[in-house]
Amino acid sequence: MAAANAPFALVSRLSPAARLPIRAWRAARPAPLSTGGRTRPLSVASAAQENRDNSVDVQVSQAQNAGNQQGNAVQRRPRRAGFDISPFGLVDPMSPMRTMRQMLDTMDRLFDDAVGFPTRRSPAARARRRMPWDIMEDEKEVKMRFDMPGLSREEVRVMVEDDALVIRGEHKKEAGEGQGEGGDGWWKERSVSSYDMRLALPDECDKSQVRAELKNGVLLVSVPKRETERKVIDVQVQ
């Protein structure tokens, strides 16, 4: 094959004395893929942020058993969303109690990560993603919200033990009793939703005036603060 007709040109920068006699060169190019004249960009997935344990000690467990028929049981794992925030274990996952200050700090971090820049939890930031719990604090009271879908007022219990706010709830449901596929058995679906949380209240909160209200599966808790008088003592300088 002549050098002028070769699909690729070969350039040698060696001296004439060091060149080896080359009789013929052949260049093989791969066959083009049938992409229809379009090029597909290469998408590179960047590493996600560290899996921070930014959540409250609200233990929610749901178990569903559908079918007691013979055969192998397959357990499906729940899908993880792109912005997966679990409401369990805020700082130390082994600690059974969380403080209200930790919850406030966690809410600030969660909303800062969601919008990408520091914020004070504006209404626009809240509209982007609804968290399963929320807490707000002002000079008069502390307001908390916990999502408890499917639970009635009789199934939720709120109490104050010493300096801790305890929230517990459990809902059991049985449905779908009937004949299974092929008529070889009966099946029944059971679901259980359970909530158990202990939250340490600060000293300035009035534990005897805690109010709780459940509306449409949302628990609203209000903890008023005591009015503290500042005492000023003049210290004589000698």
Curated annotation (Swiss-Prot):
Low complexity composition-biased segments: 58-75
Keywords, alphabetical: Chloroplast, Plastid, Stress response, Transit peptide
UniProt GO BP: response to heat
Cellular compartments per GO CC: chloroplast
Region of interest: Disordered: 31-87
Compartment(s): Plastid, Chloroplast
Predominant location category: plastid
Keyword Transport: no
Record domain sHSP: where: 124-238
InterPro entries: A-crystallin/Hsp20_dom (IPR002068), HSP20-like_chaperone (IPR008978), HSP21-like (IPR044587)
Coiled coil: none
This protein's record includes keyword Transit peptide: yes
Top-level taxon of origin: Eukaryota
Family as reported in the entry's similarity comment: Belongs to the small heat shock protein (HSP20) family.
Name of the molecule in the record: Small heat shock protein, chloroplastic
Name of encoding gene: HSP21
